[in-house]
Amino acid sequence: MEKFEKFLEREGLLHILAEHRKRNFPEQGFKETYVRCAKSLVQVKGESALKDHFSGMPLELVASFNPYQLENKDGELQLIWRGSGIGDILVRVFHKQQKTETEYFTNKQGKVTINLDVPGDYLVNAVHMTEGAFNRGELWTSYWASMTFQIP
């Protein structure tokens, strides 16, 4: 349970721990499954207009900016859960070269503005958890949205 608790704390999901205990779920020997929802924003040579869009993944980060033509040093993302913005979710931004991690939370519409003032490679991620498939013995399912891009 200690490993599960640390994971929940790191991902901003302590409410899941409270729910786990409230339901008297077992402390050990339970299953948690996960779903990865990953995308990369890549500029194709000769293309100048990169536009991200919702592709239909269960949990998805959608950028309203083109990282290759960033006009200011901030970029807005929306975290979408099953077609609608989801609020109060931890979004972490990792910068590869600087070896930094910055944390943000989505607003009620699932939107968050992140700082992108340093050129380099970025990874943005967010995690959302739901009840698992009890008929398969899974107590929880975590959905991992991630996006990578480069700021030139």
Residue positions per predicted region:
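Hydrophobic beta-strand segments
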Residues: 89-93
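Beta-strand-rich domain onsets/edges
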Residues: 7-75, 80-87, 97-99, 138-152
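Glycine-centered loop-to-beta-strand initiation motif
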Residues: 106-116, 120
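Blade-edge beta-strand/turn elements of extracellular beta-propeller
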Residues: 100-105
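Short, aromatic- and glycine-rich surface loops/edge beta-strands on solvent-exposed regions
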Residues: 1, 121-131
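A mature extracytoplasmic/lumenal domain signature
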Residues: 95-97, 118, 128
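Short, conserved, GDST-rich strand-edge loop motifs in beta-rich repeat architectures
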Residues: 133-135
